[in-house]
Each structure stands twice: as structure tokens, then as C-alpha cells.
From Swiss-Prot:
<dbReference type="GO" id="GO:0005886">
    <property type="term" value="C:plasma membrane"/>
</dbReference>
<feature type="transmembrane region" description="Helical">
    <location>
        <begin position="27"/>
        <end position="47"/>
    </location>
</feature>
<protein>
    <recommendedName>
        <fullName>UPF0060 membrane protein PA3275</fullName>
    </recommendedName>
</protein>
<keyword id="KW-0472">Membrane</keyword>
<feature type="transmembrane region" description="Helical">
    <location>
        <begin position="5"/>
        <end position="25"/>
    </location>
</feature>
<dbReference type="Pfam" id="PF02694">
    <property type="entry name" value="UPF0060"/>
</dbReference>
<keyword id="KW-1003">Cell membrane</keyword>
<keyword id="KW-1133">Transmembrane helix</keyword>
<dbReference type="InterPro" id="IPR003844">
    <property type="entry name" value="UPF0060"/>
</dbReference>
<feature type="transmembrane region" description="Helical">
    <location>
        <begin position="59"/>
        <end position="79"/>
    </location>
</feature>
<keyword id="KW-0997">Cell inner membrane</keyword>
<keyword id="KW-0812">Transmembrane</keyword>
<comment type="similarity">
    <text>Belongs to the UPF0060 family.</text>
</comment>
<feature type="transmembrane region" description="Helical">
    <location>
        <begin position="84"/>
        <end position="104"/>
    </location>
</feature>
Length: 109
């Protein structure tokens, strides 16, 4: 259960870090946005290492579903744009896929 905490925290740090660069490069905001962006992306990487997993690739694949869901919350609450039904369908498919990766049977390796 603690993995979900790290996944969600990491997702919002990654999104915030990327959004800082988006503000600078796409919306013409100050280049100073790079500094909190770099800090946030560094924190994202550190947080993702807190996840208990035997293999990094499997942890990152499971994280992908959480990231996609967090992105829609960012869209709704930070950018104030209402997600479409197709956005939510896409999130549901991603979360189901991530759940298969996370909870699927494991052969002894």
C-alpha cells in the first residue's frame, strides 16, 4: 500500500517539473521556472526509488497508470480544463494495464 503513496507523490512531482518547463518553453514564462522544474524532477526520481519492487522496469510500468490518472487531475485542477469522457476511458485502460503488471502472477525468477 505504501507503494501507492510513493507513486502518487512521484507522479505529481514529475508532472509539476514538466509543467514548469512547459510554462517556460510553450507559454513564454520566465526561464526561472526551470529551477523549480529541475528540483521537482529530481524529487520525482528520488521518490520513485522508494517503491518496493524486484525490478525497476516493472515498478515504472505500474507507475505509468498512476501517472496517467494524476495527469488528468492536474488537467482538471491546475489547468482548469474539464477532462473528456475519452480521457477517463483512457485512464481506466491504463490503470487496468498497470494493475496487471503490478498484481499479475510471477514465475520464480
Amino acid at each position: 500500500m505504501i507503494n501507492y503513496f510513493w507513486f502518487v507523490l512521484a507522479a505529481f512531482c514529475e508532472i509539476a517539473g514538466c509543467y514548469a518547463f512547459y510554462l517556460w518553453l510553450r507559454l513564454g514564462k520566465s526561464a526561472l521556472w526551470v529551477l523549480p522544474g529541475l528540483l521537482s524532477l529530481t524529487l520525482f526520481a528520488l521518490l520513485l526509488t522508494r517503491v518496493e519492487a524486484s525490478y525497476a522496469g516493472r515498478a515504472y510500468a505500474a507507475y505509468g497508470g498512476i501517472y496517467v490518472a494524476a495527469s488528468l487531475f492536474w488537467l482538471a485542477f491546475v489547468e482548469r480544463s474539464r477532462p473528456l469522457w475519452s480521457d477517463w476511458l483512457g485512464v481506466a485502460l491504463c490503470v487496468v494495464g498497470a494493475s496487471v503488471v503490478l498484481f499479475g502472477p510471477r514465475l520464480s525468477q
